[in-house]
Curated annotation (Swiss-Prot):
This is Protein lap4. The modification Phosphothreonine is found at T1599. Residues 589-601, 676-686, 1807-1816 have a biased composition (Acidic residues). Residues 1468-1478, 1647-1669 have a biased composition (Low complexity). Disulfide bonds: none annotated. It is a peripheral membrane protein. It comes from Drosophila melanogaster (Fruit fly).
Length: 1851
């Protein structure tokens, strides 16, 4: 009995999504079957389910079903019950066949049946017309159905791993197919009709038996990927040249012997794989594929490469392993981007010297060849690996320069050259132990030593020698080179780059600071030896063991650090040695990571003597560290080459020191090494430097110069001394769009480096015109941070994951190399370089002058940056603020540096907070606010937390609560704002800064649907807001009254303002400080009165008013904010956003009052905030009140203007009390594709042109050209000239006709231009985008089935678009619950009909549209587009729940609570007002036109307080042109009912149905008002002022305006309507002494007067004479112009001529009921008494609650029956009224004739006869009156069933 108590979890759950993947379920859980009414997505993948129960197929609402990776053995036919299924995945099961009943799943779009033993597809499978993605991999299919081409919507078809041999011919009908996978089948012949798939992008044909390709394959012009590997192809068709879009071509493992010439025309080809074929030569034109990046030619029979290979300038990877190459073409040096060249196992004997021009080559594999030496030009390359032998242990060897004996050329050699065949190592060598000391093993080694007497080297041919030890080889080489250098002249001169060609300092890298903490053992300074070899590039220096310690110098370490170190050394020789030792020199020992604890070990330097051998040199134990040989593709650092900039700085410092030396004994060293040796020596030192700089740049200001990364060069080797290469740092904001970010990355730890030996993350590709390109990102930028996360040391996959989880806005911090012009060389008289003139840029700390301050930009930051050091920032920026412009917006404006602006030195405090005296940037924080919405109570949020009190800390020295894990696909993952490492500051308003872990878990697991999180993210960067390319270029000032200056505190886009941090602390410690003195001239909020403080919060004053709108400024949610005022701020002062006081800000939940204050005033009044001015003149006798009722201002949206930047922007306003109400606007801006224009020539001598036009400057062109009107093609006749042309379509804009511009022409002028005589007509058209929602709908009606929809609109009909009264289109106004339209499901209420079976409805009348649809037959081809949104209209009138933005948010009508449920599905609530013509029966139903969509609620007779008669009359006046707010004036004292009816009849439209409805409404309201008035006590009578105000409210109904189109908010003309209310006092006297009552004039339309307008209001007869109440008679005079018919005037004259000689009280009571004739039936005293007693009893009876009546009728049928009853009753009553009036007129005529006859015959008759005649006439009149009342009672009786139906409908 208690199972349905709501506290139980399983009761009434609205479950829509269930995910039970990987749960080891043996069967479908039973609880899932309980959700049959709500469940839409069910995932049961990866379980052990064998059978599907019968009840499982009752889940009729399922849209997505996942059953993959189970053990299902049968798919029952009951699967046809899933009519709404869109996605089905049953792959990896044991299903033997697919039931034929699957054809009933007409909504299925994605299906996967892969990995099931299914031998064939069912015959009905081809009826799944909506399938777009179909997976049939790994099945046993041998054939496909012959009608497989019927799946015309297919975009992806996978048939891999089947047994297919043939394809059906109908497959060519799959015109939308983009991806076709036929790999791993048994296809021998590819059918030619496969080339007729115009949209194909990817084609997989690998692992088949193909021997040839059809020539028709060249027709696939959009094909980008073609894989035909592992087939038997012997040749390719030359038509392959037609694949102009092809980028990837895989021809591996075939039998090709030659390539067709057409392959050279594939200009977009980037990857070509031809390995394992039989190619003997390549085409000479293959080089025309200029975009080639990867060319694989492994295992062929090639003996040479074509010379055109040099044209492939983008080639990155060339692999020609295992061929028969004998030489390389010289043009190989033109491949500037070649990075990997593999020539293994060929017959090469030499390499061309031009190979040295491939500057980015880093891997060269020439093992297995016959090379004698390597070209000397390889020293210019930054090689990481040179493979010369199979058994090579290190990727890069030490090479020695040598001379070729035959040619005399300078070459490189090593111990593996000349190349020989591979010889295995002897076993004895393998047994040698590496653990024993080197000194002990050295005597047992076989070492080749060179004798020292061989001082002169002879030119000898290359002879293979035993490999010497590297130490001995180095000593010998140094000795030989130094001996040779002694004979050179000018040994101590520094040569120009033209003389020695030094290529040392050209490696672009960032400057690094060297920190050496190890003390070196002092050693005797060796005698320096001078030596320079002009034939070889050298580095001159002295190797001297001295103590050198280079301290870190921040970013500008480099040469400054080296120079400062050199100055500390006394001897100039030692200075040179120190520099060389610290930065460049011959260091053989630098500590690794695992050896850093060895701090006191001496750092020894090795120097070589020239005079004689030093025994101590050989006794010194060398520190050789064993390293594993890295693979050349695994990005293991092979050799750390010298950084180009580091080399520049060191060489410049050395040369500068040499030129500045004046002491004679300072001579140069004789150490001469090759650049490769030097780079090898620097390897380990640079590793140490990189370890010391974990985060070289942590700033995010854009642009940020990384200091002087390359100091001004003073050496001629540095690019002639005129430029420098520096690294600048930028922060770039990219907003993600639906197409992605438009960028690709490369590199990372463990991946092939993108640039040089840098294993960082680089931007490898930027999509043109994509988000990244528009944001300013460039290829080659190195990514430092992604949304605050450092990715310097991340691997590639980690970087990809960070980018995926970045959310909607991506904030990248990148480094970019920039070349700067810095100076020029100055030559002295002797021709030497005496000085380098460098433009010095002093880095001063003073603020720049006002003229150099850069432009200010308003940057909407994507996230809220809350720096801790904001006070420090204000102090640093104080000088700049003093000279800033007066109107600067300091909240989010920063200054970008201009050319005149300078940067401070690194040793001072930088204003941007990058580096302060060499320290890291200050730590800032990002405040994030997000709300996670559960789909159901109890659902997980998709993230885990760690930390908190009582739990192990997540971060050191912090016991806060942090996000530790985010579940992929969960709520947090889909939200996109939360990241791992974020600190949780608050959960649903609960402070979490000092909370326990269990408390946070309890808050997160509470049964609440909305979980509001406040997060804090660390942000190391500048204190200013970052730049954004989305921002406007220049924003000099902001209006103080504008939106940005007064925007609500909790309004947020994806970008929010910069605010100060608020901490979650108690308010008791808050101490107010005195206000700083702020001049009034710089105050921004001039209208704000001083506010007071209460409990630390600033309470907003009541007089806070926006100066521009006069509306209250929203209450602030937080007290402190960035100062928004203009002008400078005093030193040391801190300003608050409200009162200028500095205090810790606190967070409090947004209360209902705060939210109410943020809503604009015009929303509170429902759009009817009128300014009513009441002028009271001096009251003399009669009180007159003049009321000016202004036309209301149109509703303005609460949001600002929609953003115009690219990407998706979500704007929300959230009201949080016990529930949460959210208003959201999503703007998704995308780049518009350029419109295509072309010229079309049509012949005019063959008849009609076959198309129609619409539009012009004087005609509407809706729905085309909504933004720019013009002339458009509205219809194309099938089979006509325009249709046969094939270039024209509906919606094309006509720009010119025979060179005559018609873009601004009127409609008639355009027609005349088209009709001008001539043999042909030349049209210039523009293919404008089709209207939104444009589609073709084919409806098929079954026999006897109804179409089931209604239409509205068209010419000469009522307007069809309630949002735009000027729209003349035809719209779908209603979809019935049964019929073809409902069954099809594509037609929706509000759609615009464009064509029906080829008949255009643009410009058609309503009746024509109805006739076309009724005569369309069973097959109806409709062309529709989007019209208006029905749900938006319901929401706009405040009836759809949520936050109303419509016209009547304060008063509601009956039925308003229902219009969000079923009404939104069928449109039945709107149907009564929108539907004009039903298309299913022939009778004309246009009489059912109602007033307007906004007046769809009818007055309910059962309401205790119904709408007043005046409001109803206002509705009659406006008809269908202005909405009447329902129940807006429900308390107005009623007027005499006859006056109201008269006004309704006078002003209602001419349609009989409208008059009838108006009469019925007036009768209902009059009857109701009569009861209320008669039962009202006298003591409740209202004052005159109250009545006047109620009349004014009623008059508002006359000024309400219909809304414009939702997309347009035009400024409407302000119409002022004047209503004059004349109040006259009358005394009601129960004694009928006066035969007539004086009537105050009632003028409606200022022309006609109505009878009884001045009659007193009905009241209860007074019990005592003399106590009659005094009631005003009110006359309303308006300026509204209406028309009346002659019939109305006749009836009015008849009403006025009726005698009124009865009792006043009786007249008041009977006047309400006797509407057809004004004659009254006298009542006796007993009748009056009984009526009065019954009325008093009814007053005291309790109102009975209407029971809910069950009805089998649907809402549509009840509505139809109701309207038919109303129409019949109105028609019957009108006919009876006419007959009664005719009968009364006939009786009067007969009496007059008889009287004349009697008077003629009996002229002497007395007064008695006359009296009898008069009495007889009165009796006849009374009988007519009685008859009229009787008929009227009959009509009222007929309305009883209508009231019962209405009661059922209301319930």
């Amino acid at each position: 009995m208690f199972k349905c108590i709501p506290i139980f979890k399983g009761c009434n759950r609205q479950v829509e999504f269930v995910d039970k993947r990987h749960c080891s379920l043996p069967q479908v859980p039973e609880e899932i079957l309980r959700y049959s009414r709500t469940l839409e997505e069910l995932f049961l993948d990866a379980n052990h389910i064998r059978d599907l129960p019968k009840n499982f197929f009752r889940l009729h609402r399922l849209r997505k079903l996942g059953l993959s990776d189970n053990e299902i053995g049968r798919l029952p036919p009951d699967i046809q019950n899933f009519e709404n299924l869109v996605e089905l995945d049953v792959s990896r099961n044991d299903i033997p066949d697919i039931p034929d009943d699957i054809k009933h799943l007409q909504s299925l779009q994605v299906a996967d049946f892969s990995s099931n033993p299914i031998p064939k597809l069912p015959s009905g499978f081809s009826q799944l017309k909506n399938l777009t993605v179909l997976g049939l991999n790994d099945m046993s299919l041998t054939t496909l159905p012959a009608d497989f081409g019927s799946l015309t919507q297919l975009e992806s078809l996978e048939l891999r791993e089947n047994l297919l041999k043939h394809l059906p011919e109908t497959i060519s009908q799959l015109t939308k197919l983009k991806r076709l996978d036929l790999g791993d089948n048994e296809i021998e012949d590819l059918p030619p009709y496969l080339g007729y798939l115009p949209g194909l992008h990817e084609l997989w044909l690998d692992h088949n038996q193909l021997q040839r390709l059809p020539p028709e394959l060249g027709l696939l012009t959009k094909l980008t990927y073609l894989d035909v590997s592992e087939n038997r192809l012997e040749e390719l068709p030359n038509e392959i040249s037609g694949l102009v879009s092809l980028t990837d071509l895989d021809l591996a493992q075939n039998l090709l012997e030659a390539l067709p010439d057409g392959i050279a025309k594939l200009s977009r080809l980037t990857i070509l794989k031809l390995d394992q074929n039989r190619l003997q030569r390549l085409n000479d034109t293959l080089g025309n594929c200029e975009n080639m990046q990867e060319l694989i030619l492994t295992e062929n029979f090639l003996s040479e490469l074509p010379a055109s290979i040099g044209q492939m300038t983008k080639l990155n990877n060339l692999n020609v392993d295992r061929n028969a190459l004998e030489y390389l073409p010289l043009e190989i040096g033109q491949c500037a981007n070649l990075g990997v060249l593999s020539l293994r196992d060929n017959k090469l004997k030499k390499l061309p010297p031009e190979l040295g021009n491939c500057t980015v080559l880093h891997v060269l594999d020439v093992s297995g060849n016959q090379l004698l030496y390597l070209p000397y030009s390889l020293v210019n390359l930054q090689l990481k690996a040179v493979w010369l032998s199979e058994n090579q242990s290190q990727p890069l060897l030490t090479f020695q320069p040598d001379t070729d004996a035959e040619t005399g050329e300078q070459v490189l050699s090593c111990y593996l050259l000349p190349q020989q065949e591979y010889q295995p190592i002897t076993p004895a060598r393998d047994l040698e132990s590496d653990s024993e000391p080197f000194e002990e093993r050295e005597p047992s080694r076989t070492v080749v030593k060179f004798s020292e007497e061989a001082t002169q080297e002879k030119e000898t041919p290359f002879v293979r020698q035993n490999t010497p030890h590297p130490k001995d080889l180095k000593a010998k080489a140094q000795k030989l080179k130094v001996e040779r250098s002694r004979n050179e002249e000018h040994a101590n001169l520094v040569t120009l780059p033209e003389e020695n060609g030094t290529k040392l300092a050209e490696t672009p890298t960032e400057t690094r600071t060297i920190a050496n903490n190890h003390q070196q053992q002092p050693h005797p300074v060796q005698q320096p030896i001078v030596g320079v070899n002009s034939k070889q590039p050298v580095v001159v220096g002295v190797v001297t063991p001295t103590t050198t310690t280079v301290a870190p110098t921040g970013v500008q370490g480099g040469s400054e650090g080296a120079s400062s170190t050199a100055n500390n050394v006394k001897a100039a020789t030692a200075a040179v040695v120190a520099e060389l030792a610290a930065t460049v020199g011959g260091s053989d020992e630098v500590q690794d990571d695992d050896e850093q604890e060895d701090e006191f070990e001496s750092d020894r330097r090795v120097g070589f003597q020239v005079e004689g051998e030093d025994d101590d040199f050989y006794k010194r134990p060398p520190k050789l560290h064993r390293r594993d040989t890295p693979h050349h593709l695994k990005n293991k650092r092979v050799q750390h080459l010298t950084d180009k900039q580091a080399s520049e700085i060191l060489a410049n410092a050395l040369a500068s020191q040499e030129r500045n030396d004046t002491t004679p004994q300072h001579s140069l060293s004789g150490k001469v090494t090759s650049p490769i040796e030097e780079e090898e020596q620097l390897e380990v030192e640079q590793e140490q430097q990189q370890q010391q700089q974990q985060h070289p740049f942590d700033s995010s200001l854009s642009p940020i110069s990384a200091g002087k990364t390359a100091e001004a060069s003073t050496d001629p080797d540095n690019l002639d001394g005129v430029t420098e290469l520096r690294l600048e740092q930028y922060e770039i904001h990219i907003e993600r769009t639906a197409a992605g970010l438009g960028l690709s990355i490369a590199g990372g730890k463990g991946s092939t480096p993108f640039k040089g030996d840098d294993d960082g993350i680089f931007i490898s590709r930027v999509t043109e015109a994509g988000p990244a390109d528009l944001a300013g990102l460039k290829v080659g930028d190195k990514v430092i941070k992604v949304n605050g996360i450092v990715v310097v040391d991340a691997d590639h996959y980690q970087a990809v994951q960070v980018l995926k989880a970045c959310g909607a806005v991506l904030v990248l911090v990148v480094q970019r190399e920039v070349t700067r012009l810095i100076g020029h060389p100055v030559f002295s008289e002797d021709g030497s370089v005496s000085q380098i003139s460098v433009e010095t840029r002093p880095l001063v700390a003073d603020a720049p002058p006002a003229a150099s301050i850069s432009h200010e930009r308003y940057i909407p930051a994507p996230i809220e940056i809350v720096p801790q050091q904001q006070h420090l920032q204000q102090q640093q920026q104080q000088p700049i603020q003093q000279v800033a412009p007066t109107h600067s917006y300091s909240g989010n404006v920063f200054a970008t540096p201009t050319a005149a602006q300078t940067v401070q030195p690194a040793v001072s405090a930088a204003p941007n907070g990058l580096l302060l005296n060499g320290r890291e940037a200050p730590l800032s924080y990002i405040q994030l606010h997000t709300t996670l919405i559960r789909d159901q109570i109890g659902q997980g949020l998709g993230f885990s937390i760690a930390g908190g009190k009582g739990s192990p800390p997540f971060k050191d020295d912090c016991d806060g609560i942090f996000i530790s894990r985010i579940t992929e696909g969960g709520l947090a993952y889909r939200d996109g704002k939360i990241m791992v490492g974020d600190r949780v500051m608050a959960i649903n308003g609960n402070d979490m800064t000092e909370a326990h872990h269990d408390a946070a878990v309890a808050c997160l697991t509470e049964p609440q649907r909305f979980v509001r999180l406040v997060l804090q993210r660390e942000y190391r960067g500048p204190l200013e807001p970052p730049t954004s390319p989305r921002s406007p270029a220049v924003l000099n000032s902001l209006s103080p009254s504008g939106y940005l200056a007064n925007r609500p505190a909790n309004f947020s886009r994806s970008v929010v303002e910069v605010e100060q941090p608020y901490k979650y602390n108690t308010l008791a410690t808050t101490t107010p400080t005195p206000k700083p003195t702020v001049p009034a001239s710089i105050s921004n909020n001039n209208n704000t009165l001083p506010s007071s403080k209460t409990n630390g919060f600033a309470t907003a004053a009541a007089a806070t008013i926006d100066s521009s709108t006069g509306q209250p400024v929203p209450a602030p949610r937080r007290t402190n904010s960035v100062p928004m005022g203009d002008g400078d701020i005093g030193a040391g002062s801190t300003t608050s956003g409200d009162s200028g006081e500095a205090q810790p800000s606190s967070l409090r939940p947004l209360t209902s009052d705060d939210f109410q204050a943020m809503i604009p005033a015009h929303f509170l009044s429902g759009g009817s905030q009128h300014q009513v001015h009441v002028a009271r003149p001096n009251e003399v006798g009669v009180s007159a009140v003049t009321v000016n009722v202004n036309k209301p201002q149109p509703d303005l949206p609460m949001f600002p203007a929609a953003p115009t930047e690219l990407g998706r922007v979500t704007e929300t306003i959230t009201k949080s009390t016990f529930t949460e109400t959210v208003m959201t606007r999503i703007t998704d801006n995308q780049l518009a594709e350029p419109l295509i224009s072309e010229e079309v020539v049509l012949p005019k001598n063959q008849g009609s042109l076959g198309f129609s036009i619409i539009g012009g400057t004087d005609h509407s062109c809706v729905p085309f050209g909504t933004r720019e009107p013009g002339i458009f093609i509205s219809h194309i006749v099938p089979g006509g000239i325009a249709s046969k042309c094939g270039k024209l379509r509906m919606g094309d804009r006509i720009l010119k006709v025979n060179e005559a511009d018609v873009s601004k022409a009127t409609h008639q002028d355009a027609v005349l231009e088209l009709l001008k005589p001539g043999d042909e007509i030349k049209l210039t058209i523009q293919h404008d985008p089709l209207p939104p929602g444009f589609q073709e709908v084919l409806l098929s009606k079954a026999e006897g089935e109804r179409l089931g929809m209604h239409i509205k609109g068209g010419l000469n009909g009522q307007r069809g678009n309630p949002a735009d009264p000027s729209d003349e289109g035809v719209f779908v106004s209603k979809i019935n619950s049964v019929g073809a339209a409902r069954r099809d499901g594509r037609l929706k209420v509000g759609m615009r009909l464009l064509e029906v079976n080829g008949h255009s409805l643009l410009g058609a009348s309503h009746q024509d549209a109805v006739n076309v649809l009724r005569n369309a037959g069973n097959e109806i081809q409709l062309v529709v587009c989007k019209g208006y949104d029905k749900s938006n209209l319901i929401h706009s009138i405040g009836q759809a729940g949520g936050m109303s933005t419509g016209f009547n948010s304060s008063a509601s009508c009956s039925g308003g609570s229902r219009q969000g449920s079923r009404a939104s599905e069928t449109g039945s609530e709107l149907s009564q007002s929108q539907s004009v013509s039903s298309l299913d029966h022939e009778e004309d139903e246009r009489l059912r036109q109602d007033f307007d969509v906004f007046a769809s609620q009818k007055p309910d007779a059962q309401q205790p307080t119904g709408p007043s008669v005046l409001a109803a009359a206002a509705a009659m006046v406006h008809g269908a042109s202005s909405p009447t707010p329902p129940a807006a004036t429900s308390n107005i004292t009623p007027l005499p009912t006859a006056a109201a009816v008269a006004s309704a009849d006078l002003t209602a439209p001419d349609t009989p149905a409208t008059q009838t409805v108006a009469l019925i409404h007036a009768e209902q309201q009059a009857h109701q008002q009569q009861q209320q008035t008669q039962l009202a006590p006298l003591g409740q009578e209202k004052s005159t002022q109250e009545k006047v105000l109620e009349i004014v409210r009623a008059a508002d109904a006359f000024t309400t305006v219909p809304p414009k189109s939702p997309s347009e908010h035009h400024e409407q003309d302000k119409i002022q309507k004047t209503t004059t209310v004349v109040i006259s006092k009358h005394t009601l006297d129960t004694n009928p002494t006066t035969p007539t009552t004086p009537a105050a004039p009632l003028s409606i339309a200022g022309a006609e007067s109505a009878n009884s307008a001045g009659a007193p209001s009905p009241a209860v007869p007074a019990s005592t004479p003399g106590s009659a109440p005094v009631l005003p008679a009110v006359a309303v005079q308006t300026q509204t112009q209406t028309t009346s018919t002659e019939k109305d005037e006749e009836e009015e004259s008849q009403l006025q001529s009726t005698p009124a000689s009865r009792d006043g009280a009786e007249e008041q009571q009977e006047e309400v009921r006797a509407k057809p004739t004004p004659t009254k039936v006298p009542k006796s005293v007993s009748d009056k008494k009984r009526f009065f007693e019954s009325a008093m009893e009814d007053q005291h009876k309790p109102t009975q609650k209407t029971d809910k009546v069950f009805s089998f009728l649907s809402k549509d049928e009840v509505e139809k029956l109701r309207q038919e009853e109303e129409r019949k009753i109105a028609t019957l009553r009108r006919d009876k009224n006419s007959r009664l009036l005719d009968a009364a007129n006939d009786n009067i005529d007969k009496d007059a004739a008889q009287q004349r006859t009697k008077s003629n015959s009996n002229s002497s008759s007395g007064d008695d006869n006359d009296d009898s005649d008069q009495e007889e006439g009165i009796a006849r009149g009374d009988s007519v009156d009685n008859a009229a009342l009787g008929h009227f009672d009959d009509a009222e009786d007929m309305r009883n069933p209508l009231d019962e139906i209405e009661a059922v409908f209301r319930s």
